[in-house]
């Protein structure tokens, strides 16, 4: 399993949000996890994390998904300009998964890491197993 950059939003004494970018979705970028502490929500942390992931992604396409029940994530993605890309039933019983695609024009801009110095980037890693490096 190959793990991509991790982004942490900082506020006050420590991290208040976390995002994980992986390249396991048809070898394209996929925002697999985005979470913000309840005390830091509605303060732009998630938007800054999504912007950092957009800037960091090294593949031509960047996707993410959210359950139909996850209205806050859907609003965030639509406000950030992401486009609906599909719907999958059966992953979570009774709660279909909506997939979103980051538009290419959002990905071609210069890195926003200088704009958001509170974003911390992790290193890409590989896992060694008895069967070889993944």
Language model features: what each stretch is:
Residues 28, 71-89:
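Conserved N-terminal glycine/acidic-rich loop preference
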Residues 56-68:
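Conserved GNAT acetyl-CoA-binding A-motif
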Residues 36, 42-55, 75, 79:
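Conserved acetyl-CoA-binding loop-helix of GNAT-fold acetyltransferases
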Residues 1-33, 37, 50, 90, ...:
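Acetyl-CoA-dependent GNAT
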Residues 118-120, 124:
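Acidic, Ala/Val/Gly-enriched low-complexity intrinsically disordered segments
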Residues 126-133:
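Short, intrinsically disordered C-terminal tails of secreted or membrane-associated proteins
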Residues 63-65, 81-99:
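Conserved catalytic-core motifs of GNAT/GCN5-like acyltransferases
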Residues 33-41, 66-68:
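A short, internal acetyl-CoA/4′-phosphopantetheine-binding micro-motif in the GNAT/acyltransferase core
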